[in-house]
Every structure is written in C-alpha cells, then in structure tokens.
A protein has these predicted regions:
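N-terminal beta-alpha lobe that positions the nucleotide/phosphoryl donor
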Residues: 1-223
Length: 223
C-alpha cells in the first residue's frame, strides 16, 4: 500500500521528490535535533493521485487522521476543541521553491466555539477574533474561490468609516463584526455556511493546495 503521509520525524533532505522541499527540510531539521513543532507532510504522490483522479486517494483520509491524532497527543490539544483548540496550517511545498505560487491556509481549527477557547487561553480576545476573521478570509479566497475583493472591500469600508489607518486600529468589536460579515459573503457565494467542522476545514484546504499546482500562475512560474 502506498504511504501518502510522513511525520516530520520521518525522512531527510534527500527526499524532496517525495516530500517536497519544505517537507524534506523539516525532516532534516528534526534529524539534526533542531526544535520543530510536530506535524506531517502529505507526499507529492498524493497530490499527483488527486490531480489524476479528481479526488484524494482512498487511504489518505485514514493516514491523515492517524498523524493528526499523534500531533494532538504531542501538543496536548485537540483540533477544534472549544476550550483549548489546536490550530494547524496547510502549506504547499514543491520539490523546488515556488514562492507565492501555491496556496497556504492558516488558523485551521477555529470556529464559532473554538475562537472563544483561543481567547481564553491566550488572554487576548482581539487576537483570537483577528485570527478567526483571517481564516474565513483566507479560506474563502483560497479554498472556495471567492473573489478576494469581496472581503477586502468590507474591511476597507469599515476602516474608512471609522477613520482607521490600518488593521491594528481595529477593536475586538470590529473584528467580531468582520467575522459575521465575512461569513455572510461565504454563504452568499457558495450557498453554504462557513464550515464549522475543523476536520472538514483541513480536508478542503488540503485539496485546495493540491489544485494550486495547476493554477495559471504556477504553470507560468514553472515554464
């Protein structure tokens, strides 16, 4: 059976064809004893299989679940936990560097409940709500193919109406308002509410990163 997922503790810098440059270098860093947060790499084989079939390989879900559980155990947190949520990022990594060409989604694991837990654990309510609005904005644009201007226009209007110079001027109340407005955009554009299931967020983000290999800008960069 093809192995599609490797923990950061597996592999080394010579496995760039399989793990991509980022994944191989993270594995090498762990091998050298450098401090690396727990995580895992989905192989380029999985990406190729997805692009060929239009869906993820049958066994990928099981492997991702197993590796996610290991990360949760190491971190002492659970993805989507309403009291102390684990947040993850889904990042791209071809075997050669393609800066800015493929997609990244941050703050996966936040939803209407876990944002409250992040606020309590961090002691910073503003940080938690800013992280959540950024997730919805990034997820909408990257994963759901919503025009980024839909979100940017709402953000800029709020700042203009209140005379703000930039993001740092926004209050917690402003950010909560943006979350609600951004969720409305997602529902208007997709016909569905922003996904509250953190695992669904992660799975959809993984597929979006796979698809980003074939975007026009990625094709142009590889020429």
């Amino acid at each position: 059976m093809t192995k599609y997922v490797y923990a950061f503790t597996e592999g080394d810098r010579d496995m760039k064809d399989l793990l991509g440059g980022k994944g191989a270098n993270l594995a090498e860093m762990v091998k050298l004893g450098l401090p690396v947060p727990p995580g895992f790499t989905i192989t380029t084989d999985a990406c190729r299989a997805y692009l060929a079939a239009g869906e993820s390989p049958e066994t990928l879900d099981v492997e991702v679940t197993s590796h996610l559980r290991n990360v949760e155990q190491e971190m002492g947190k659970r993805l989507g936990d309403k009291n102390d949520p684990l947040l993850v990022s889904v990042r791209s990594g071809a075997k050669f560097s393609m800066p800015g060409m493929m997609e990244t989604v941050l703050n996966i694991g936040l939803n209407d409940e876990s944002v409250q837990g992040l606020a309590a654990q961090s002691g910073n309510e503003r940080f938690a709500w800013d992280s959540y609005r950024r997730l919805i904005q990034m997820f909408g644009k990257t994963v759901q193919d919503i025009d980024g201007d839909r979100f940017a226009d709402i953000l800029h209007k709020l700042q203009a109406d209140k005379g703000y110079k930039g993001d740092l001027d926004m209050t917690t109340a402003d950010l909560k308002h943006l979350v609600e407005e951004f969720k409305k955009v997602v529902e208007e554009e997709t016909g569905e509410a922003f996904p509250q299931d953190p695992r669904r967020q992660m799975d959809l983000a993984i597929e979006a990163v796979f698809r980003s290999w074939n975007t026009e800008r990625a094709h142009i960069y590889r020429r």
